[in-house]
Amino acid sequence: MEFFSNIGKIQYQGPKSTDPLSFKYYNPEEVINGKTMREHLKFALSWWHTMGGDGTDMFGCGTTDKTWGQSDPAARAKAKVDAAFEIMDKLSIDYYCFHDRDLSPEYGSLKATNDQLDIVTDYIKEKQGDKFKCLWGTAKCFDHPRFMHGAGTSPSADVFAFSAAQIKKALESTVKLGGNGYVFWGGREGYETLLNTNMGLELDNMARLMKMAVEYGRSIGFKGDFYIEPKPKEPTKHQYDFDTATVLGFLRKYGLDKDFKMNIEANHATLAQHTFQHELRVARDNGVFGSIDANQGDVLLGWDTDQFPTNIYDTTMCMYEVIKAGGFTNGGLNFDAKARRGSFTPEDIFYSYIAGMDAFALGFRAALKLIEDGRIDKFVADRYASWNTGIGADIIAGKADFASLEKYALEKGEVTASLSSGRQEMLESIVNNVLFSL
């Protein structure tokens, strides 16, 4: 059965095309620096938003039909698979990401739920063949009432045990589907008030859960990356995985820093009052850059809007960081994004993905041009040149101490003249110059 019979394979037509069902900047098979664009960008479909998100929000019911022609949950789960792979094929998307309950809902017991999940993952494995791949999987340990106080950080040991069992199965499903990543996102791992919270115990327990996951994952042959996806709030008032720097502190405290990388989401950076590039830079500088949830938020709003990314400045600086990090290895660009509630037709799925894919393709082209242009890199290198010789080199080499630095400062006198302009406006103009000359 074809779900989108009125939509053909989306073709690259170039920037002058006015056909909304065409790529203007994403040319999947174009070879750049020895790799095709699809290999550089590694786009992924998000199973939750794309296959299940029907536009329901806190103020109204769904506006789009995501039943895929099936009323029975088991039949619907398989129909989702067929529809997802049709979307991916028509958009030249090679990867998908999932929560366990996106693939198959809960049934009467954990065993029944696991049995039904096995049926669906068997079907996915059969249908994906060598054409489609799992970028990463995760467990949906946040929506059911049992997780109202958290999963790994729950005050109930029974809930912790249930969470571990669910994660165990999600890891098995990820391995079965050939996934190269497994994500922890702590939607309920945090608190509403410290009046009823044992923060130390909760963080200790979260670390215990993650250590168990790493040990079990490796024992069943998972060779990919474990990720944590930082987010400061929503649905919890204060989440423990607030931002990349906070997560790094957590990982280092519990000896998990060699086991985990970051899955950075643009909208989560906005909620933490950081730029997207800031979060990527912190991850890159600390050797924990892994994967990206590609979306954008609204800076005028205080919640996770999960819009499809269309801001070219953001995608350019994102891809600048990705390229500087050496590109993706096991990670990729997962569109953790949903069409707006008022964009409710089947065609809107394709319009949305085309917008996001073109935005990142253009950002990738611009980032490459920025690096090849070299003016920004040269400016930064020149700005810090004093650290290459003389007293700067001595400090870096560990040859200086307070006594020698005091002696140097006394002999040198006032040092204000050693400073140069930061030239922020000039550098921003260079970015514009590169962007609008593509």
UniProtKB/Swiss-Prot annotation:
Keywords: Carbohydrate metabolism, Cytoplasm, Isomerase, Magnesium, Metal-binding, Xylose metabolism
GO molecular-function term, one example from the UniProt record: magnesium ion binding
Domain of life: Bacteria
TM stretches of this protein: none
Cofactor: Mg(2+)
GO biological process, one term: D-xylose metabolic process
SUPFAM superfamilies on file: Xylose isomerase-like
Cellular compartment(s): Cytoplasm
First-level EC class: isomerase
PROSITE patterns membership: XYLOSE_ISOMERASE (PS51415)
Annotated positions binding Mg(2+) 2: E265, H268, D304, D306
InterPro entries assigned: Xyl_isomerase-like_sf (IPR036237), Xylose_isom_bac (IPR013452), Xylose_isomerase (IPR001998)
Binding annotation for Mg(2+) 1: E229, E265, D293, D336
EC number: 5.3.1.5
Gene3D superfamilies: Divalent-metal-dependent TIM barrel enzymes (3.20.20.150)
Location, primary (coarse class): cytoplasm
Catalytic activities: alpha-D-xylose = alpha-D-xylulofuranose
GO cellular component: cytoplasm
Catalytic residue positions: H99, D102
Cofactor binding, note field: Binds 2 magnesium ions per subunit.
Subunit structure: Homotetramer.
Similarity comment: Belongs to the xylose isomerase family.
HAMAP family referenced in this protein's UniProt entry, alphabetically: Xylose_isom_A
Alphabetized NCBIfam families for the sequence: PRK05474.1, xylose_isom_A
Protein name: Xylose isomerase
